Amino acid sequence: MWMHKKILLKLSGESLKGESSYGIDPRTIKKIAWEIKEIKDLGVKIAIIVGAGNLWRGRTGEELGMDRSQADYMGMLGTIMNSLALQDALEQTNTITRVMTAFPVSSVAEPYIRRKAIRHLEKDRVVILGAGAGSPYFSTDTAAALRAAELNIDVILMAKNNIEGVYNKDPKKHQDAVLIKHMKHQQILSQRLAVMDITAASLCLENNIDILVFNMLKKGNIKKVVLKEGNIGTVISSKGE
């Protein structure tokens, strides 16, 4: 079977809130867990990074006049909360998981150690990576690119909410926006497209890591992108094809 065999799934925090305005929606996180289990049962090695936008937004810190580092650490703690929630949802599907965090939270998770994370993947455990990159000023997109490089991941699957992929302009503001099916990493940098931040895009370019941006809210899309079916989303690669 032709498929991606080792993936990093990047979930936004918003993907966990479903139709709610805040927090974690039980039905949504269970649905995501079952879709992850489905690809896990195909033999795919899976690492996951979750954002925290459902619990904390950087702009809230700005509105409060908070120090940027303080606000970023709050976001990192939010990703740990989401990681634990996703771990529980996955384990309800009888999927073996490990949560590893970029800074120690020893009561609830393992510290991130590269060689240990690789070993967990080799043992077919789903590895959920919390606390982003562990330092302020680095987004969870950058953390995803960093961990993908460290763990020799084939592709980063960037799951979006009701957005089919990368467009030539904002589809929420422009009805004539066109979906781009294939592009190069360099286009993100040169055109400053809002796919991921520049640091993350640069890391992917330097380490030749492919990115696939897709709409995760359509049932079965995670499996389809893993199996390379249906020509879904936008593929970003060094070749642009």
Swiss-Prot record:
Superkingdom of this protein's organism: Bacteria
Mechanisms controlling activity: Inhibited by UTP.
Positions annotated to bind UMP: D72, A133, G134, S135, P136, Y137, F138, S139, T140
Keywords from the named record: ATP-binding, Cytoplasm, Kinase, Nucleotide-binding, Pyrimidine biosynthesis, Transferase
Swiss-Prot/TrEMBL GO biological process terms: 'de novo' CTP biosynthetic process; UDP biosynthetic process
Pfam families, per database record: AA_kinase
The UniProt record lists the keyword Nucleotide-binding: yes
Main location: cytoplasm
Claim: Cytoplasm is one of the keywords in the record: yes
Catalytic function, reaction form: UMP + ATP = UDP + ADP
Similarity comment text for this entry: Belongs to the UMP kinase family.
Name this polypeptide is given: Uridylate kinase
Gene that this sequence comes from: pyrH
